[in-house]
């Protein structure tokens, strides 16, 4: 079951977007130096269409994007909820996923406007470091384009 612990409006995770970042628990990656180790636990409330709709109704006039922060243990469910947002909000909200997996999930294509891939490796840093192993992709023209360099300006 996909669960979320909290959420916040953020400005740096996705370029040029005001993003509702929803933190998902049950992370399987256990990255050394993780900034949110509590998200490795199976905690929080179920994130389903009803819970997501309630969140979006509260913030839809304040945000341009929703980002699922994690959820790799339930990747198909994250992709399904992204599709639900696209259909229900008819493209008015962009969708993003911060995944710790090294590769794009096969179901991500067409469901997300942005996807971050790669586990956090403390020695390499996050997306804002030129040494990072992580990548940020934007879906454009039917495929994902690497825009990681935009995060390093």
Q: What are these regions, as identified by a protein language model?
A:
Residues 1-23, 28, 36-41:
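N-terminal [4Fe-4S]-dependent radical SAM core
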Residues 36-48, 58-76, 91-104, 114-139:
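Core AdoMet radical
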Residues 79-91:
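Surface-exposed amphipathic alpha-helices with a cationic face
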Residues 139-153:
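Charged phosphate-binding loop/patch that engages nucleotide di/tri-phosphates or the phosphate backbone
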């Amino acid at each position: 079951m996909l669960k979320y612990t909290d959420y916040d409006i953020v400005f740096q995770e996705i370029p040029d977007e005001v993003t509702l970042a929803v933190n998902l628990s049950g992370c399987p990656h256990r990255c050394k130096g993780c900034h949110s180790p509590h998200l490795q636990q199976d905690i929080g409330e179920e994130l389903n269409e009803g819970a997501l709709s309630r969140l979006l109704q509260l913030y839809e006039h304040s945000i341009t994007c929703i980002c699922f922060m994690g959820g790799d243990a339930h990747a198909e469910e994250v992709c399904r909820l992204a599709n639900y947002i696209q259909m229900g909000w008819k493209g008015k909200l962009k969708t993003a996923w911060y995944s710790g997996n090294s590769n794009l999930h096969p179901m991500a294509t067409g469901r997300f406007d942005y996807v971050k891939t790669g586990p956090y490796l403390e020695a390499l840093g996050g997306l804002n470091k030129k040494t990072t192993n992580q990548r940020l992709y934007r879906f454009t023209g039917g495929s994902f384009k690497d825009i990681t360099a935009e995060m390093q300006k």
